[in-house]
UniProtKB/Swiss-Prot annotation:
Homotetramer. InterPro entries: Glyco_trans_20 (IPR001830). Pathway: Glycan biosynthesis; trehalose biosynthesis. Probably involved in the osmoprotection via the biosynthesis of trehalose and in the production of glycogen and alpha-glucan via the TreS-Pep2 branch involved in the biosynthesis of maltose-1-phosphate (M1P). Catalyzes the transfer of glucose from UDP-glucose (UDP-Glc) to D-glucose 6-phosphate (Glc-6-P) to form trehalose-6-phosphate. Probably also able to use ADP-Glc, CDP-Glc, GDP-Glc and TDP-Glc as glucosyl donors. The keyword Amino-acid biosynthesis does not apply. D-glucose 6-phosphate binds at R25, Y101, D155, R335. UDP-alpha-D-glucose binds at G45, G46, R297, K302, L400, V401, A402, K403, E404. It comes from Mycolicibacterium paratuberculosis (strain ATCC BAA-968 / K-10). This is Trehalose-6-phosphate synthase.
Amino acid sequence: MAPGGGRGSKTAGYGNSDFVVVANRLPVDQERLPDGSTAWKRSPGGLVTALEPLLRRQRGAWVGWPGIVDEDVDHEDDPIVQDDLELRPVKLSADDVAEYYEGFSNATLWPLYHDVIVKPIYHREWWDRYVAVNRRFAEATSRAAARGATVWVQDYQLQLVPAMLRELRPDLTIGFFLHIPFPPVELFMQLPWRTEIVKGLLGADLVGFHLTGGAQNFLFLSRRLIGANTSRGAVGMRSRYGEVELESRVVRVGAFPISIDSTALDQTARHRDIRRRAREIRAELGNPRKVLLGVDRLDYTKGIDVRLKAFSELLAEGRAKRDDTVLVQLATPSRERVDSYQQLRNDIERQVGHINGEYGEVGHPVVHYLHRPVPRNELIAFFVAADVMLVTPLRDGMNLVAKEYVACRSDLGGALVLSEFTGAAAELRQAYLVNPHDLEGVKDTVEAALNQSVEEGRRRMRSLRRQVLAHDVDRWARSFLDALAESGPRDG
């Protein structure tokens, strides 16, 4: 059944939530305080931003890890209610975090799904832990869900949960959405556990991807690895779903590009305090003629090095002026215990130091670099202050930062430079699209964005805003859940 208006009556052997979201993390983080007690704080991330309002309206439950290590994984804590959200914590031990999360999820699946920018590592011990933790999530979800409930499983860390949950609770309607790219078939085939992953996903009634290409790849793999009959027609965006025929049921496969709460962002960005802070930011930067901005997790997929290299060469060639152009890079710390991420941070900070050493002046660097989280309203002020937004990933499932920047520009100012290899590029066609592997092309595109006329900038931004404001996160969730509801309830 589709999510209803609240928590159902509890039935023996079932939970009491008619709608359950399952994700690697809860929408709040648990912290241990110096006195040994614990406290909760809101956790960052696009997934939380996208799903929390929907779940709150539905008064459902959220199953996820609270963010702290707990060796007593067999002891189940009672559900927690925070701001009218029922939270179902799943405990992870230090070994779970090392092998399931940092290992299989982020050193095996993440690089494989992002076109092998970094070589994936295949360890059988990591796979075994991934299976065990996915089962723990499935069991926690089974305990939370009311009879006939709708369950929405999120992302690459939990790709085995749909099949495990189907086995435990055939009465449930199960959806799965992948928030990162789904790789080309020839890359996915490298995975030693490729068949198990596909079977895991086929436990869902609906499997969703950002783009039609990911959906088509999954249909092909279902034929090749499972021997299933599948639809052969093209999958459409938010329409024309593919189908995988199993022995007793049909799994639908679709493309549902995620978005943001664009109306809320638009309203916040118009606020007088945000506008004042944006002016202050420009003043603190020395009132340059042009401000370029990058906002990313510090991740090797994001192409931060590409934009820094392009900016450095534009300065060297005199195509950007060191006395009136600055670049601000906000880099949120990410996966700091993973070797490739530690190396990336060293490389980026060395690059920033080199550029400032070559082109900056005392008290006036040309690159301003922050390696820490930035409060939400401060980030919005940076969006309002920036003349050019640089979004240059080598591969990205969607990239919500691009949409957030557009939502904040009610003044129709600014320019968006956007990698062709983001999901967002399929929708934001009036951005300055760029191939991040083509450095000369990146330089030319950034220069064009810096020098665009007011009329050209307003024309592009008006079109971008029309797209982003019309296709918001509510529409994304609605389109997925409507398609999931059409799968119908399952009788146990």
